[in-house]
Amino acid sequence: MAAIPEAGPRAPASDAETVAARYPRLRYMGSKYALLPQLERVLGDLAGVTVADPFSGSGVVSYLAHTMGREVWASDYLAFPCVLTRATAANDGVRLSEEDLNELLGPNRDGRSYISRTYSGILFTPEDLAVLDSAWSVLAAWEGVRRDLAIASLILAAARKQPRGVFTVTAPRYP
């Protein structure tokens, strides 16, 4: 479980639609995007400053609570939702620079090919898989929010690149 630092003094209730529009959209089973207006009302009516988001998924509920000035404790069974939440709700303005992106998308540092070997013929082109292997070779040396932000960016890019959703696999959609 990760503690998301407080956003400072409690801000006025945020506009849930604005929060949803700012938050990176991820097609995720059980996503709470549609519930944000109701969750905002409930959180606004509750006393206290701490919100638990035990099944954080896309992280949008944690982000909403954070924008409302709440301290957030977020967790998930899977690792990637925790990374998404740390990169968004726990990120105090860190952004990847152009140099970071050039490094991340640059040459493979150590020749790793696990992703290419394991996922060949599934979901992505060989070129896409090689980019992911290369990015992971760079990420091995990165730490903290910068690393979380880079991984979150790769997760979101991969989710958009695979338009059929994360639970469909193998063959191209149209011959």
Positions of PLM-derived features:
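S-adenosyl-L-methionine
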Residues: 1-55, 60-67, 91
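Class I S-adenosyl-L-methionine-dependent methyltransferase module
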Residues: 71-175
